[in-house]
Amino acid sequence: MEEYPRYLELDRSRKNDFLFPLIYREYIYRLSHDHGLNRSILLENEGHNNKFSLVIIKRLITRIYQQNHLIISANDSNQNPFLRYNKNLYLQMISEGFAVIVEILFCLQLVSSLEESEIVKSHNLRSIHSLFPFLEDKFPHLNYVSDVLVPYPIHLEKLIQTLRYWVKDPSSLHLFRLVVHEEWNWNSLIISKKSISIFPKSNPRFFFFLYNIYVYEYESIFFFLRNQSFYLRSTFSWVLLERIYFYGKLEQFTDVFANDFPSVLCLFKDPFMHYVRYQGKLILASKYTPLLMKKWKYYLVNLGQCHFYVWFQPEKIYINLLSKHSLDFLGYLSRYRLNPSVVRSQMFENSFIIDNAMKKLDTIVPIIPLIGSLAQTNFCNEIGYPVSNPTRAANSSDSDIIARFLRLCRNLFHYYSGSSKKKSLYRLKYILRLSCVKTLACKHKSTVRFFLKRLGSEFLEEFLTEEARVLSLIFPRVSYISRTLYRGKVWYLDIICINDLSNHK
């Protein structure tokens, strides 16, 4: 929040029309340009360093309005004169500016909500490594898990209409619609069963943001009913009027959802149901029988079909036994296994040997998908054999090349340091280290053996010290407010940079 002090000082009484003037502010595009919204750990955006002109951006916006189009198709791009001058760069800059502006809007709403709660600073962003104590505590008591692929909106216009409920600025929304349809660069009809990578690679963060707003619409209904039902179960009889009022509201929802809502009210009374969503995937886990999981499954299908006009593909929603199924979550393969132990107990003159089997959580690094990601970026081949990458060494010094490989190795160890087995991490380090040496040898037209002798043991020590530095990270202790926020059922993770590692196929 400290990064946006000048934006958060805006007049909050003009929430409906303060967005449009920000489009012409140079610091908006500087912020999106300097922070590198599209950076990736495995791919470095070399085109992001291109210079841009705010004057050209203003002219493009003016000419967009002069076109007087509501939708710009892919065939119209050749006829529009304002798109002939470096079209991709400036459309990308405008969309990135929109991404910063709408995030500022949500930051303002977050600050106002925190001020009402008398919380000075938000501590509810947690690292990925805080998930493992949660999984160790909760997952051994669960029995069934279901992976669901969140469907995409049928039409791109639905994303824009969803944003209309949050942004009350017609001018900004009109320009936003024109830019988004043009940057989409093909038909706005989305017919795909692939992952969320279908969004344009030029500015995926903005489309992720729109997609999350769209999913939030039905999640808000889901969480409202779940929290209210769970709250009313634990209240005393003197709040019976509130209970009756809430059930009356449920009856009104039947007209909205077009299904028999009271029949599925029992679903929200399950205290052991866990709901997790990340990227385009959601996970349901429960302690009870598969029958309850099937009810949850058909409830989500009916909710999406009747109210949001999307299809969840129920034939691809599988209910798996957690003890026999590995959970693919945020780049980890998590499963629990029985850890047998023998305890000897003695009472007076008699001794007993007790076999005790405890459930233990295993978090495994998926080595095959990671090798595939490294192969796509030319660090190794498909079987994991390190190769040189001459394109990265063309205009870089030796120190820059080594620093780039060390940074990638550090990020890998940081992200996967919660793994229970480190053998796969050492294999990844071997691939990166040898690929770095081969890249340097190819640059200097030398052999790997000669270059290893030239670098000496200091080169290996840099990789070892980087690993030790990462694995010995000491995270700051959280305050009392942070601990109280940690007890909530909704989780927020501060994973903002390492996107490629947690992508699911």
UniProtKB/Swiss-Prot annotation:
The cellular location(s) given in this protein's UniProt record come to: Plastid, Chloroplast
Function summary:
Usually encoded in the trnK tRNA gene intron. Probably assists in splicing its own and other chloroplast group II introns.
InterPro entries tied to this protein? Domain_X, Maturase_MatK, Maturase_MatK_N
Q: Which GO terms describe its cellular component?
A: chloroplast
Q: Which organism is it from?
A: Rhizophora stylosa
GO terms in the biological process aspect are: mRNA processing; RNA splicing; tRNA processing
Q: What is this protein called?
A: Maturase K
Keyword terms of this UniProt record: Chloroplast, mRNA processing, Plastid, RNA-binding, tRNA processing
